[in-house]
Each structure stands twice: as C-alpha cells, then as structure tokens.
Amino acid sequence: TGGTLDKMDSIPGYTTQPDNTLFRKTVEEAGCAIIGQTADLAPADKRFYGVRDVTATVESIELITASILSKKLAAGLGSLVLDVKFGNGAFMADFDDAKKLAKTLVKVANGAGTQTTALMTDMNEPLASAAGNAVEVKNAVDFLTGAHRDPRLETVTLALAAEMLVVSEVEADPAMALERAHEALFGGQAAEVFGRMVHVLGGPADFVEKHDSYLEKAPLTAEVGAPEAGHVQTIDTRAIGVAVVELGGGRRRREDEIDHAVGITGLKPVGEKLDKGEPIAFVHARDEGALEAAKKAVLDAYTLAEKAPETSVPVAQRIIG
C-alpha cells in the first residue's frame, strides 16, 4: 500500500515535511510528530540504496541495518523500539530471517549508544481491518476514539507503547507500562494528542471529531461476499496490499500519484466464521474495472474451510541487546 506519509497526506492541510521550527513546535505542543525525513538527514542513504538496487543486495541484512539505523541514529534518539515484522505481508517473510534482522538492528543500535529493543510481530494476516490511505486514517482515528478497535492492532500498539515506556526508563515494570499505555488509549489522551498534532501540523482543529467529513471517499464501493460458508483459514496479506496498489492506493513507480480515497475495509480476520455471501471485505474504487479486479484479488487472497484454524498471537518475541 502507500507509505505512512501517504496515509497522513490524506488529511487536508497536514504537512509531512515541516521545517525544523514547526517540527519543534509540534513536539513541544502536542508531544509527538508523524513526519518524513528531510533531505539532509543521512543523505548518503539514498545513494547506497541506488547501489544496492543494481548489485542485487537490496535484501542484505547488513545493508538494511545500515539504512534503517543511519536515519534513527542521525536524529539523535535517546532510545529506540523497533517493530520487526515477519510473515506473508512482511518484507522479511521468513521468521528466522526477520529474527536475524531484529538481532542485528538491536546489536548495532545499542553498540552505537542508543538503548534499543525490538518486538517481532506477525504479518501473516492484516494487522487491521482496513488497507489503503484515507481508510487507514479513519481506522486509526476510530481506534484512538474507541469507535472501532481491531484486536490485533490493539495488542501490537499497546505492546509497542509499553516497550517504549520501559526502554526510555519512564516505567521500570513492564506490567505497569502496559497499564499506563492502556489508560492513555482508553482514557482518551491518545486521541487528544493525535488531534493536537494534526492541528499544529496544518490539519483541521476538529479532525478527530469530524474526520469522516474531511477524508476523501472513493465513488464506488462494493462488498466481497464469501463464496462458501466456513472459517477464514489463511490470508495472503501481500496480495491484499498489491490489490490496494492496483486500485491506485500505492505506487508501482516512484513518480506515480497516490489516490488517497481508494482501499479495502472490513477485512475479516483469520478464524472468523462466515456464512455464504457474508462480506469478507468492502472494496472502495475509482472505476468499475479496478473495482472488479480488486474484488477478485480479495477472494483469491482468502482461504475458507469448515474447521476453525489455530490462531497466532500478534507479538511473537522480544529482542533485547
């Protein structure tokens, strides 16, 4: 799908490339800022990636480590928590490869003087029920306000938040850290902070309360019905992402424009019991051709069977230095 910044660009007026003055103002007033790197932060990284692209070393764990950490270390972080994903929707699909990457990242970052840990999280199914740009922003706001919270997203989000409290030495006890993260989410503070951040970075002051009126919607929506009754056995997460790209919600080439309105919502999780014809998901498209292609892609990505499958926990392992 689109990148994180493409999703935030769905918000009218929001700037993902603020100057240092606005960046500092946002952090001071809101407490956080979701922004992109500037051209002068680890500028050599883009050159190295260009070389990797033509030398078949894009998947080199050592060079991936250098690329990821160059930006983090250059920013001068006091501590760092990494979410290293594995599974059919992750860059490193194989668990052992992902674990090797996580261990390398943690070892190098700690060696450079930044207190770092990593959580390994499962992407053998979508983390949330939405995939796209504006639809994911809506999903995130609904998550923050409590209008709708996908269970796997809640587990991973709270685990990462708690880990950050521990690694930054704000809270020594992991159980207490998790409780504090839970209170911030369910007490509404997280939604308030997000709303302040959006406003300081140029978005609407009432975005959290009225996000539905600000986010662009695709002109066509259609449900994808289950072809038979049964439990969801597996989901090809990468195929769902590719379907969003084909809708226009991601880039095939760097110069491609992103359609923020398109995407897929209502994605049923692994283990869900469905009747024949019950919606597996809803496709939001710009035209009929893209709509039908995405509906087929979603059907092809899902496997149903009579027996309920074993489900996995979303946070598989914690990697420490």
Q: Predicted regions span which residues?
A:
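Aromatic/hydrophobic pocket-lining residues that form π-stacking "cages" and hydrophobic walls in ligand
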Residues: 23, 68, 105
